Every structure is written in structure tokens, then in C-alpha cells.
Amino acid sequence: MEIFKVIFLGIIQGLTEFLPISSSGHLVLFQELLGINTDQITLDVFLHFGTVIPVLIIFWDDVRDIIFFKKEKRWLTILILVGIIPTGIIGILFEDFFANLFSSVKTVGFMLLVTGFLLYLSEKLSNYNKELKEMQYHNALIVGVAQGMAIIPGISRSGSTIVASLLQGFDRDAAARYSFLLSAPVIFGAGLVELKDALSTGLEQLTWLSIIIGTIFAALSGYFAIKYLLYILRKGKLTVFAYYCWIVGIMIIILAGIF
């Protein structure tokens, strides 16, 4: 794989992993419509690991306290664990089903329309007043289920989790903070699963230079994506991403029908 394609995929992975526009949907889109092969197991592994890095940097205070299970953040650690449970169950039981059922480009387009609708709905109907400390176990479970549904290409992981929090009345900062903290172990876990597959097939597919470059660009683009999304959330302009999802979704459906 040429270096510029590795850089491109790294940037796409970092941006779409955290912006509420569906990373899986865009990867399917670029693979099918632009002829870019994303079926590089080794690269996928390190792109996933690369996107964990900005979460660790931006939310380091929370991450450090969670890792060391500090008493003052024990409540947050438990909420993260509770949220991971339904995500893991859905991923283990239904990943192959959804991957086979919803892997067509046209269906990705329809799912992006759904993502846009949910983003728009959350911005218009939500009553943001709860802080993250007010989150209960059932709230975390609902967010975890929403994250699990993001295995459907075209459904955004960050979008679904943020929407799930907003529709339960949590403020924007709480929704974003919990979404990104919940994403880190899930993304890291997905990377470990892919690493197992890569080890079984061999790691000779790419040079270490390509792997390092792809990881760096995934981390850098992921960092700026998180910062930008936090800015958009605080400005109350989440509908920007809804319009984007609608436009891209309609374009995908039209192009899929033509070709």
C-alpha cells in the first residue's frame, strides 16, 4: 500500500472515529466507491491504537484516576465498566450478522440518514441540565447499548453515545466526556481483536514505516477531531453534522443506484 494511501486512511480513521459521521460507513464508502482497499488487518490494528492516543491525552486526568481506581473517581470507573458490558455483548453476538446485513454501500447511505436524524433530534428535543456525576447505572447501560449499535456501518459511535446521553438530559460536556472515555477501552479492545487476527495471518503485509506513519496521522487527526467536536457541542451546533450525514447519505444512495 502506497504511503499516501496510508496517510489518507489514517486521517479518515482519526476524523471519523470521533466526529459523529460514522467511521465504518466512510471506510465502506471509500473502499467501494474510490477503490481503496481497507482490508489491511495490520494497518487496521495500529490505526485503532492510534485513535486511542488523543483520548488519553485530552482526558488524561480522568484516565489516570480510572486506571489507578482512585476513590474520588471510582463512580466514573464503575460507569465506564457498566457502559462497556452491553457494547461487548452486542459486539460478540451480533457483529457478523450486522456486518453481513448492512455492508452494502446503499444501506450505509440509509444509516447515515438515520444518524443525521438522531443528531438533529437530540439537538432540538433534549433538555441539557444533568452533570456526569448524576448518571445512574441504567443511564450508562443505555449509552452502552447505543455504542453497541454502532457496529452497523453508517451509525456513528460517537454520535450514538452522545445522542443517548443528551436525550437522557445530560449536558453537552457530560455527554462528550462520557462518550470519549467509554470509547477508549472499546477501540483498544477492537484493536486487540484485530491484532489477534493479524498475528494469525502474519504481520508482513506492511512496512513498519507505513504502520508508524498511519498511526501518527490517525492520532493527530483524532486529536483535532475531538477538539473540534467539543467546540461544536459547546456552541450548540450539533446539527452541522446532521446536515453533513444527510448530504453524504443521499449522495451515497444516488451513486449506489447509478453504479
From Swiss-Prot:
Bilayer topology: Multi-pass membrane protein
Ranges that cross the membrane: 1-21, 40-60, 75-95, 101-121, 179-199, 206-226, 239-259
Subcellular location: Cell inner membrane
GO biological process, one term: response to antibiotic
Gene Ontology molecular function, alphabetical: undecaprenyl-diphosphatase activity
Protein function: Catalyzes the dephosphorylation of undecaprenyl diphosphate (UPP). Confers resistance to bacitracin.
Additional detail: Bacitracin is thought to be involved in the inhibition of peptidoglycan synthesis by sequestering undecaprenyl diphosphate, thereby reducing the pool of lipid carrier available.
The protein's name: Undecaprenyl-diphosphatase
Gene source species: Halothermothrix orenii (strain H 168 / OCM 544 / DSM 9562)
